[in-house]
Amino acid sequence: MPAAIPAFWSPRIGALEPYVPGEQPRIENLVKLNTNENPYPPSPMAVDAIQQAAASGLERYPDPTSLALREAVARRHGLQADQVFVGNGSDEVLAHAFFAFFQQAEPLLLPDVSYSFYRVYAQLYGIDCELLPVDEGLRIDVDAMVARARRGSAGLVIANPNAPTGIGLPLARIEQLLAACPERVVLVDEAYVDFGGESALSLVGKYPNLLVVQTLSKSRSLAGLRVGFACGQAHLIDALVRVKDSFNSYPLDRLALAGAVAAIEDEAWFRTTRDKIVDTREGLSLQLEDLGFEVLPSQTNFVFARHPRRDAAELAALLRERAVLVRHFKQPRIAQYLRISIGSREQCGVLVQRLQEILDRP
């Protein structure tokens, strides 16, 4: 009987290759450095706001416009509330953006090494994609993207800083992409920008084709709450609202709305924890280099590294045996790299110790 179940599926579903998230295992004393979670708890103000929101009002639907949160995001970034869209994590925001903007006659342009969910969204919505190779240093080849975009496309999507490489682009290069694609949307996914990248939010007023997507999962320690947002000119936000209200009018619950507003407003907590992560990242990069790893320059809360004499998949497996979890990707161009989330200083110390033990083995 199970073999017959796919007969009920829509044809596109059978062909889908869904995104595979990093595992969330239950291993005692695990050092978990595989999903780029923040090692520090969220703002106490956010926790208090969530607890207060849970105390009353849960029998009522939340605000379908999420106005208080959109206003908080707008205040933080010098925008207007009608330039902000919010959703149940940046993945949902990205999915709505793909549906709203990229179902065109021409292909959507993506770097060949980037967040793998982009290709899943495209496949889900029947969007044709063209993958443009990153350069030998695994940097997004802006010149190649500009040249290709000028011949026509459905738009561009890049992560900046890029994932899983951690390498960022300066704003001048983002502006080149925007200028090359004036009739289509350029989506800049800034999930990791708070750890050292240059945000394109300052360009929203200048470019009607720019959509910037961010998340509260990483730098605000709210991965368990699922809150993301997009910023762009009002006509882009209107399109996202139309998609949202055709799918789920209430994507953010009362607890998420309350916690997210408080987390955004607690600037001091954000800066303190963010600075700890950046400092730990720089120290870990040096320690990995001392162990013989090649470490790409990172502007994120992770590092991307390879060892010239050891297989990355084997290293990941040996670390897992020692209760240290990192992320390995099988994609050919990056199959010899490990993506290592920046944990606490103590967690990173355990990682380095375990790697030293593995590398010392004959």
Predicted regions and their residues:
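PLP-dependent enzyme catalytic core of the Aspartate aminotransferase-like
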Residues: 172, 317-322, 327, 331-362
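N-terminal "arm"/small-domain region of PLP-dependent enzymes with the aminotransferase-like
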Residues: 1-60, 152
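Conserved PLP-binding catalytic core of the aspartate aminotransferase-like
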Residues: 277-278, 288-322, 338
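Active-site phosphate-binding strand-loop segment of PLP-dependent enzymes
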Residues: 136-194
